[in-house]
């Protein structure tokens, strides 16, 4: 089925910027954080002090204007101040498989947006295989790191950035 924003409009493919607003945790928005000795922040986090947060775009190479739950997607920050804007999943200590940003993207991304309760969740499909893993939140250093946490997804609503 079609992925909808907070106004009930279809989320558009490779167009518009969207806030991911947490359903459960009240306030907080997407941000980037440095981990270890990274030269620039590359870890995607939900930061309670950062609202409404960075905006993302959903992209599929399919020639279709809207995003559906069955589509494999690239997710990227827009507008981005750095070359690294595309989401990927990589090992990160101690969170495990964490969402990071990279400057390279495959044509078809490894994520899907799927309905969950009051909102949506992001599901990571390694190698775009059959089995998906929920992207959840791992709490550390007053931030919530987006990481694989199967069965405990981060549930959010999708608000178009122009609907202030």
Curated annotation (Swiss-Prot):
<dbReference type="InterPro" id="IPR011065">
    <property type="entry name" value="Kunitz_inhibitor_STI-like_sf"/>
</dbReference>
<comment type="function">
    <text>Inhibitor of trypsin and human plasma kallikrein with a Ki of 2.9 nM and 14.0 nM, respectively. Does not inhibit chymotrypsin, porcine pancreatic elastas, human neutrophil elastase, coagulation factor Xa, human thrombin, porcine pancreatic kallikrein or plasmin.</text>
</comment>
<feature type="site" description="Reactive bond for elastase">
    <location>
        <begin position="63"/>
        <end position="64"/>
    </location>
</feature>
<dbReference type="InterPro" id="IPR002160">
    <property type="entry name" value="Prot_inh_Kunz-lg"/>
</dbReference>
<comment type="similarity">
    <text>Belongs to the leguminous Kunitz-type inhibitor family.</text>
</comment>
<protein>
    <recommendedName>
        <fullName>Kunitz-type trypsin inhibitor BrTI</fullName>
    </recommendedName>
</protein>
<dbReference type="GO" id="GO:0004867">
    <property type="term" value="F:serine-type endopeptidase inhibitor activity"/>
</dbReference>
<keyword id="KW-0722">Serine protease inhibitor</keyword>
<keyword id="KW-0646">Protease inhibitor</keyword>
<dbReference type="Pfam" id="PF00197">
    <property type="entry name" value="Kunitz_legume"/>
</dbReference>
């Amino acid at each position: 089925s079609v992925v909808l924003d907070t106004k009930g409009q279809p989320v558009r493919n490779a167009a518009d910027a969207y806030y991911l607003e947490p359903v459960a945790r009240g306030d907080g928005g997407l941000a980037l954080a440095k981990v270890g000795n990274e030269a620039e922040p590359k870890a995607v986090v939900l930061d309670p002090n950062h609202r409404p947060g960075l905006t993302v775009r959903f992209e599929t190479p399919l020639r279709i204007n809207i995003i559906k739950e069955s589509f494999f997607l690239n997710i990227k920050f827009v507008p981005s101040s750095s070359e690294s804007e595309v989401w990927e999943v990589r090992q990160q200590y101690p969170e495990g498989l964490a969402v990071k940003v990279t400057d390279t993207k495959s044509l078809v991304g490894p994520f899907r947006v799927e309905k969950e309760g009051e909102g949506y969740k992001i599901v990571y499909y390694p190698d775009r295989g059959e089995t998906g893993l929920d992207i959840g939140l791992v709490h550390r250093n007053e931030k919530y790191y987006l990481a694989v946490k199967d069965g405990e997804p981060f549930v959010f609503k999708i608000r178009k950035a122009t609907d202030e």
